[in-house]
């Protein structure tokens, strides 16, 4: 019984330690990618693109007669997601603006489409920055993706609203257990959000994303999205700060604040999906101290860039992620930034990486003394990856040297300090 209890405690401790390491890794990337700043930039661009986006969406849906009678429902669907607590004032303004776009000329209509495409392009670039994609999509491939999103996105929204309406009138509108059926139907928007976020995380990054990771990120983002909607509605109804300060103009900052929250949720889900794919916990059963934290990863990146340079080509971030010899992939972005900041690597005109320093003149000690410790395993555990194992002999020597140099009893240090103070 005691052995089983110890095993359970050990397993629980391992799960807690691994979860803590995962969220610590996710938080480091969250800060490194400046998610809050990126969300603000996207929120501002979305605010400027909101009317063109809704106008283009409704215009595309007009092409399909089946969606013609659902204009009001589709508009309400978009308002619930872009402005859940703004009331009829904002709806009135936006419907007025959208109706005016119908009288635009062909050039004006094309300009609206260009604005929306720029927004989609910014979203694509921001998400790919999270996945540390150094090489952008080819122009034809990128245009095809953006145009597909622009044309099929509204169809997806219309289909969701149409399916919800059909299910409501055919199954839920009458019959027994009407209250329970209505409650079940209330979860349909959450399901739509899960699907939308899943497709966003699965298709937009120019990386291979696992199905389960994208689905988990979609679920997390959908839950956070619903919580954000409820909190924002409560905030606006209970604390009328914006209305008190801005008066009739309060609808603009409130709308901007809500769109900002939306993008924070979207990018947080993206960071979660990225972390699921690239986090690798250090194996540390005995919690043995590693005096060479970060060295294997830095040397592995340098080796990959050097070998590519010798072969007449340049290493890219995408190739580094795909390489099995580049060390812990979760740290690649930090390693490359560190090497560039210290003048050892530089970025070429076409986005590749090249050696800047004379590697004959730079020693391992020079590199070691400049390593930013906070970017690596803060717990001091040994990473047992292939790039780390080759440093085991050197690691043992350094550990032994430290052990020999630090055999001084603490009482000696305390007494020396006391004597000097007196």
From Swiss-Prot:
One Pfam family it belongs to: Virul_fac_BrkB
GO annotation, cellular component aspect: plasma membrane
Membrane-topology descriptor: Multi-pass membrane protein
The keyword Hydrolase belongs to this UniProt entry's keyword annotation: no
Keyword Metal-binding: no
Main location class: membrane
Keywords noted in UniProt: Cell inner membrane, Cell membrane, Membrane, Transmembrane, Transmembrane helix
Entry protein name: UPF0761 membrane protein CT1325
Organism: Chlorobaculum tepidum (strain ATCC 49652 / DSM 12025 / NBRC 103806 / TLS)
């Amino acid at each position: 019984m005691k052995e089983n209890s110890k095993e359970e405690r050990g397993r629980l401790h391992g799960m807690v330690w691994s979860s803590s390491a995962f969220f610590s890794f996710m938080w480091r990337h969250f800060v490194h990618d400046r998610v809050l700043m990126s969300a603000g930039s996207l929120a501002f661009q979305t605010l400027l693109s909101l009317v063109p986006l809704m106008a283009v969406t409704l215009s595309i849906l007009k092409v399909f007669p089946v969606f013609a009678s659902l204009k009001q429902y589709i508009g309400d669907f978009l308002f619930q997601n872009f402005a859940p607590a703004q009331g009829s004032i904002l709806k009135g303004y936006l419907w007025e603006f959208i109706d005016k776009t119908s009288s635009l000329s062909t050039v004006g209509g094309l300009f609206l489409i260009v604005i929306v495409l720029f927004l989609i392009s910014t979203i694509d670039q921001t998400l790919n920055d999270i996945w540390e994609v150094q090489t952008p999509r080819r122009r034809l491939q990128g245009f095809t993706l953006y145009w597909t999103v622009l044309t099929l996105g509204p169809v997806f929204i219309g289909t969701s609203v149409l399916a919800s309406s059909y299910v409501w009138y055919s199954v839920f509108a009458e019959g027994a257990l009407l209250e329970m059926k209505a409650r079940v139907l209330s979860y349909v928007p959450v399901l739509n959000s899960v699907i939308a976020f899943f497709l966003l995380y699965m298709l937009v990054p120019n990386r291979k994303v696992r199905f389960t990771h994208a689905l988990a990120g979609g679920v997390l983002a959908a839950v956070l999205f619903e919580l954000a909607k409820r909190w924002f509605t409560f905030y606006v109804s209970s604390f009328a700060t914006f209305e008190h300060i801005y008066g009739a103009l309060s609808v603009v900052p409130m709308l901007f604040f809500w769109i900002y929250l939306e993008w924070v949720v979207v990018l947080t889900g993206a960071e979660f999906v990225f972390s699921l794919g690239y986090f690798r916990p250090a194996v540390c059963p005995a919690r043995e101290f590693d005096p060479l934290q970060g060295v294997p990863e830095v040397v592995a990146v340098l080796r990959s860039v050097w070998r590519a340079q010798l072969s007449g080509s340049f290493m890219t971030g995408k190739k580094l992620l795909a390489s099995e010899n580049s060390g812990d992939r979760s740290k690649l972005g930090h390693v490359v930034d560190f090497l560039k900041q210290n003048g050892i690597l530089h970025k070429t005109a076409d986005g590749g990486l090249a050696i800047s320093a004379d590697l004959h003149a730079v020693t391992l000690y020079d590199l070691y003394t400049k390593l930013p410790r906070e970017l690596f395993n803060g717990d001091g555990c040994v990473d047992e990856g292939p790039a780390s194992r080759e440093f085991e002999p050197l690691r043992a020597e350094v550990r032994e040297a430290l052990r020999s140099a630090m055999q001084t009893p603490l009482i000696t240090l305390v007494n020396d300090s006391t004597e000097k103070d007196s």
